[in-house]
Amino acid sequence: MDVTPIPGAALGAVVHGAHVTGDMDKTQFEEIWAALDAHLVLVFRGHRTPSYEEFLAFGRRFGYIPKTGLTSGAHPDHNEILIVSNLVEDGRKIGVGDAEWMGWHTDYSFRPRVSQVGFLEAVEVPSCGGETLFTDMYALYESLSPEERKRMHSYRVRHAMRTGYEETIEEKLQREVSLGGSGEQILPEDGTSTIHPLIARNPRTGRQSVYISTLNTERIVDLAPDDSRKLLDELLSHAGKPEHTYAHTWQPGDIVMWDQLGTVHAKQAFDPAELRVMRQVVSIFDDPTDPWHAEVAA
């Protein structure tokens, strides 16, 4: 397996020669983790196209893959696999998504059990547009002064599924749930709204990130609404800065794996007359409290 940093990119590396199934050996498994921690985004190329089952098994090597909870838009036999597309067949929408810009986010931040790693595979791509952008949110935290870091560690943030998507989620999962909130068992798929600390910590590397997004972050609950909006806008202005962002131009067969805790991602718009069809799985942390053991900055 060969890992090559992407020339001129702020983050990201291309991986050739990987065994993209669940039965990879321990050496490759550890090499992929190390590469992800170093580069945050990995682009797998030159591999045999995995079946749906192999794609799911590959993702499961890197954490628990929850079901999407969607009533439509997921693979009919494997609800864990999200179909992302603008495809319409016989008047019926296939998957979720459209050709418009999709704002900065990290998957499942509105659930108490947040995402750890994302996996997105390109099945069909448009001739232009549809790139996925990734911004390093560890870099944002590391740019803060010690005083700013200490203040940020005291804040909690409400995340919620974006308006208009609630009806696609199973009704029993539509609620606000927070870790330690009620003592009841929390299912991996539970929740469409939750509260998390503003600062997250990668349990493997110890790096800390500012855990917010434009798409799913509603407000900092410890601040007045106007103060919350002002600070969130200031922090989110980091997203998309070229010195901290990688724009991935898709090729059919690409599998991109990324650190969901330390990055946010967005999708560029494309011509709706063209097709963009992807399949995605997301792993969550085995211990849902792992991302929230951040130590207060000195």
From Swiss-Prot:
Pathway info: Antibiotic biosynthesis; pentalenolactone biosynthesis
InterPro entries xrefs: PentlctneF_syn, TauD-like_sf, TauD/TfdA-like, TfdA_dioxygenase
EC number annotated for this UniProt entry: 1.14.11.36
Residues the record lists as binding Fe cation: H105, D107, H265
Gene Ontology molecular function, alphabetical: dioxygenase activity; L-ascorbic acid binding; metal ion binding
Key word Cell inner membrane present: no
Protein name: Pentalenolactone F synthase
Source organism: Streptomyces exfoliatus
